Amino acid sequence: MQDHKQRFLFPDSDIRGELVQLESSISRIIEGQNYPLPVQGLIGEAVAAVALLASTLKFKGRLALQAQGKGPVSLLLAECSHDGELRALARHSDGQDWSHGDIQTLIGEGTMVITITPDQGRQYQGIVPLSGDTLAQCLQGYFQQSEQLPTRLWLASGNNRAAGLLLQRLPNQLSTTDGNTQMWEHLEALASTLQMEELLNLDDQTILRRLFHDTPPQLPDAQPLRFGCTCSRERNRNALISLGNQELQQLLEEDGEVTLTCDFCRHQEHFDAVDLAEMLRESR
């Protein structure tokens, strides 16, 4: 299965949908990280979620979901770019009982931040409390508070796979309020019959045909999705320079070298004494 996102539209109504199915990018995100299984599941749901939400981007940029709380998972971060590059990470404590995988147990009391960062222009942030029992419920609260658009999400993750379904009612343009309300209630009821095992294991065409066989949606071309990281030697170099003269001098004198590891992709960049001395000169 190639990782992809499939948009679907219902003729003569102001309702749209997105279906995301991921495998290789999830495997790449979690490999070598030693995440407990419930944390892997939470990461998978978050990655599927940002892939769905990034469909709202009308410009070049990135969308990020960040959740922080007082539970054993102190940080959950997932990002998707306008062209379908995905990455994610989680920070968690050790020695925990990982038998429960709901968001309230894993992250606990906290907040979720959705950040939209255009390549050009001003950044936008929406902040909501982690008040739902699932990540999907928390995101539905975000849409209700920040976007004020009726939105339903279904997220599933397991066995190095993740998938998501989004259904959203847009402002009236193609139909009347009554017509859109009736169609929304009908489609929402149909989508609610979806089982998480079906979302994870069936192909998108089969899922959409089973759910909406009486109102077949239009299917534009699917968008491929893939793992991708924005780390680079230049960014790591700039991060070291930003430490300032004193810390750079200390690194040079005590260690003579430094290796930085990207938290997302585990790529390492090594800087030797010559590199550090050059950075020290630049920072003065």
Swiss-Prot record:
Principal localisation: cytoplasm
GO cellular component, one term: cytoplasm
A GO molecular-function annotation: unfolded protein binding
SUPFAM superfamilies found in the cross-reference section: Hsp33 domain, HSP33 redox switch-like
S-S bridge residues: C229-C231, C262-C265
CDD domains: Hsp33
GO biological process: protein refolding
Pfam families in the cross-refs: HSP33
Entry keyword set: Chaperone, Cytoplasm, Disulfide bond, Redox-active center, Zinc
Superkingdom field: Bacteria
Record PTM text: Under oxidizing conditions two disulfide bonds are formed involving the reactive cysteines. Under reducing conditions zinc is bound to the reactive cysteines and the protein is inactive.
Compartments in which it is found: Cytoplasm
Family: Belongs to the HSP33 family.
Protein function: Redox regulated molecular chaperone. Protects both thermally unfolding and oxidatively damaged proteins from irreversible aggregation. Plays an important role in the bacterial defense system toward oxidative stress.
Protein name per its UniProtKB record: 33 kDa chaperonin
Species per Swiss-Prot/TrEMBL record: Alcanivorax borkumensis (strain ATCC 700651 / DSM 11573 / NCIMB 13689 / SK2)
